[in-house]
Amino acid sequence: MKHFTGERRKARELAVQVLFHLEFSDNDPLEAFRLIGENFEMAESMTDFSKALVRGVCDQKSKLDKVISRSSKHWRLERMARLDRSILRLATYEMMFLKDIPPRVSLDEAVEIGKRFGGEDSSRYINGVLDNIYNTLDSQRDEETFSTTEHNSEGTKEPNNIGKVNMKYNPLELEPRWQTHWEKTGIFKAKEDPSKEKYYLLEMFPYPSGKIHIGHVRNYTIGDVVARYKKMCGKNVLHPMGWDAFGMPAENAAIENNTHPARWTYENIAAMKTQLKRMGFSYDWDRELATCDPEYYRWEQLVFIEMYEKGLAYRKKTHVNWCEKCQTVLANEQVEDGCCWRHPELEVTKKEMNSWFLKITDYADDMLEYCEKLPGWPDRVMTMQKNWIGKSHGAAIQFPMVGAGDAIEVFTTRQDTLYGATFMCLAPEHPMVNEIIEGLSQEKAVLDFVNRTLKMDSITRTADFTAKEGVFTGRHCLNPVTREEIPIFVANFVLFDYGTGAIMAVPTHDQRDFEFAKKYDLKLRVVIKPEDSDLNEADLTEAYLDRGILVNSGPFDGQGNLEALDSIADYLETNGIGHKTVNYRIRDWGISRQRYWGTPIPMIHCDDCGIVPVKKEDLPVVLPLDLELRSNGGSPLPFDPTFTETTCPKCSGQARRETDTMDTFVESSWYFDRYACPDYNEGPLDAERVDYWLPVDQYIGGIEHAILHLLYSRFYTRVLKDLGHIKIKEPFTNLLTQGMVCKATQQCPEHGYLYPKEVVEDRCSRCDAHVTVGNIVKMSKSKKNVVDPQELIDRYGADTVRMFCLFASPPDKDLEWSEQGVDGSYRFLQRVWRLVVDHLEELKKVKAWNEKRDFVDPLKSVHRKTHETIKKVTSDVENRFHFNTAISAVMELVNETNHFLNGEGKKDALAWSVVRKSVETTVILLSPVVPHITDELWQMMGHVGSLLNVPWPDYNEDALKTEKKLVILQVNGKVRSRIEVAASSSEMEIEALALADEKVQRHVKGKAIKRVIVVQKKLVNVVV
């Protein structure tokens, strides 16, 4: 029986129309058939076939509706268009009960009928629903759970005779087997080879929490696909993994679990390493490192000493960001919205103490310049770094103190408003505050205000919602150009971290200053006015912020305010009251941490010699492991005499060891260099190997590190270059910032957020209350919308999890978690498995077709689709990392191959050779994504070894050429027909063929044609 001849399709179309009619009437099916069938001319056998379809659908309607509804939560029959519903029931009936019609044929025919009756939207919808139904039924067949009486295409009943697939897809058996094989053969190990082009692929290494989360899985799967693809393209690939092992999380967890951070960390490393291996990631584990290993941080200590000797590391007393919960200092970059980056519920306060700093400001200009030389970095990251570095051109201006010889220096980018400065504001941290208030009646009020303000974080102090407050110091200074005495305030919105910690306040042209002046009844002076009108201070209700003409500005009156910036700066320099300068928002990197679990700072304090570095030959300064941690989170190091008491390297007298440890971002600022030579013990880095591998060609990680790890790494790389350890200036050539993994929350009115396993049929398992489904947000333990990757691996296998993480969205976009999506990925892999296994005997008889030859359809379609897919997947992976569209293209190739195999095309040796090429291409293209199943199928087809050693396929340009193309025909925007035209047809020829089409003529008959629109030779719209 031919399954998709023109007559057969006509019979199906008749059946659909009858079923559609029955949606609106109570007619008997045969009566409906008689009414509708009058318009159809077809052979008696086809009429009988159509009647059998209608009768079967009506008899099995309840069962069909149940299958359609249960195939996904995303659709319900009662919400579907009636026509779509009729087509779906018919196709589902064929797939379930007509065993002599291949299910894929039923699906394809339904899609075509949907296209004919409902247009592209209907066709796409039907295809999506039926694909899910097809996969569901396929899974049931594999598991022999689908057992019912079957019908054949003639409408007669036959007993079910479905047997087991010869070889079942069992990922839980084959995946560990292949992982063992890969490890034994050392296939992932990298070695320097000057004859080969290197490719260094790296994902940001994890903190060893003990359990990988789905964000890890997505991030590392993205990297693994790229690494495997590049290796198949002939590159010498380095793909290492290690552990960001120091830091407060391990220390806090150890305190909570009454254990030692070292034990906690190394046990977690072992557990996570096992999990990562179970995912099949292609890591070179010989290069594994942990930053808490003394053999790693000894070289970090050496570099610190070298930086100290070069003046790039120093210690000073300063106001620092302090987290009470962490009991340690935070760098500016670690304060987010005024709170600790690790404890967003806790506001950061200011504390004065001695701290160690690295001079990142020395490299600000160079890093800023190179922001324009990193085209492989996202614009968003570069913008964030530029803004954080914050380079500003302006002027430094001296405001002499009244009654004293000192002056207060101000940095401003708005020297054009200098004549309007009517008061001065200092930051509470400004070193001159204590000096200028000493002995004055305002001293206590000012000190109280300073202490109160320093308890607020910088973000809160400058936020719009915070009231702008200040206190008069009792002192004045001179405006250097007007010579007017102006009052000096201490204000909460002025930060010592920016500029000089002092601002000249111009209330008429700055809204914040305006509000402050109004609050404290301070003088206003307009110095910029619009070109066509005047401004009066008494009439102002807000500051004038637009550009304009200078007034009340001495010799600069009448000039445009922006045009006068340079001339005013020159005037200041000429008169010795200021000079042009550049200011940066970025401040030196404070690396001191008052915690235990970190790299000891290798410095010694001697009462006679001051600060002295540890002798380089005495490195590493090893963190003692026999200390008991303090429950308040503070470091035990200052209280351990065996650690603190030492001798001075200079005078050999008694001395004290530095007890601060380094910010853990120091360790992560160079680990990627050490991967190139993890076994090197003559220094931090082996120049020869580092020169071969660095820079990292592709780095992958979260955008949350834009002004933390990524900025620090760029700085540290420059330092290592200047110290002579490496030759590169930038560590990462290309950067991909992956999106977050998101999932809807579930809340119980009594128990709050619930884990997925605590919800049973939309009810709380603890109290049976109805559960509310909330917004789709980033997965987090606090909201309990997390998914355990291990549970998924145990259920579906690693390949399915890998595939879903790549297929659900592009890597730089957020991924919305979907159980149905995971199911769909698993079912697709089952289809690929059966594509090989079901035809293995025939496939093994032939070789894949690799010659040039002209074919005829349907074989030509398979041949063309094979090479189209190679081209599409290569482009998507190589140029865009759009793995989702690459996978979709392979799915289309699988559909095309199955369509041919289920059709009536000749199945001779040539055909099987072309099919083998298609099947092998499918397996090869999928191998970076799902390496276990593809290596297994590759071996089944008679090959030896892993696909990782198989060259990535090239496409044949000749095979992509097509003689005909499909053109969609519309009348007034509605699809009415489709025609095939020669690929070389002109627009005029296509227009003529469209107007001659029988269906188009039927819809334009008796109407005037206003115009005919031909769109890119793909669509014709006839407007009547």
Labelled PLM ranges:
Residues 158-211, 367, 383-392, 577-580, ...:
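Non-catalytic terminal extensions that flank enzyme cores
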Residues 223, 236, 430-531, 536-538, ...:
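Catalytic alpha/beta core of large soluble enzyme barrels
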Residues 168, 177, 181-185, 256-416, ...:
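Residue patterns forming the tRNA-binding/recognition surfaces of aminoacyl-tRNA synthetases
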Residues 169, 392-396, 529-532, 538-570, ...:
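Long, charged, mostly alpha-helical binding arms that flank functional sites
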Residues 121, 244, 309-324, 497, ...:
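Helix-rich, typically C-terminal accessory recognition domains appended to large enzymatic cores
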Residues 158-196, 427-430, 439-444, 523-534, ...:
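Basic, alpha-helical terminal appendages of large translation-related enzymes
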Residues 1-161:
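N-terminal interaction/assembly modules
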